[in-house]
Amino acid sequence: KKQHLEANIPTRLYCEVEQAQMERAIQNILVNAIRYSPSGELIRISLSETHGTIRGEIENTGVRVPDDAIPHLFEAFYRADTSRNRNTGGTGLGLYIVRKVMEMHRANYGISNINNGVLFWFELPCKQPVDNSI
């Protein structure tokens, strides 16, 4: 689709997670961003850490989610706006899986419309590494 990806990810972040599940969740979010962004649009991904919490944001431009669909996006098999979904594929389980993984990790998460696109965000509480240098 020739979309543009802009990544702002620190070289080192520490957080104990179920790696395979967290990778799947982030992959599902990225797949949705790619799937619902028109060719040539920008997708941004960023991660940051503040006070033991990692905040992740994935933003895509070009297509907004209908406001009445936002509360349902994390439900199993829910797909918003069928006119856009006809050619996109998918089962309606991607964001449901994201929800389950985020809940398992006690993370806050959400989706909101911004300007001319969508922002998915999560805030993941993390244990700090033990300093064994003493």
PLM regions with names:
Residues 4-14:
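Conserved catalytic submotifs in the C-terminal HATPase_c
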Residues 33-34:
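Short helix-loop "hinge" at the ATP-lid/N-box region of the Bergerat-fold HATPase_c
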Residues 40-52:
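Short beta-strand/loop element within the Bergerat-fold HATPase_c
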Residues 106-112:
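Glycine-rich ATP-binding loops of the HATPase_c
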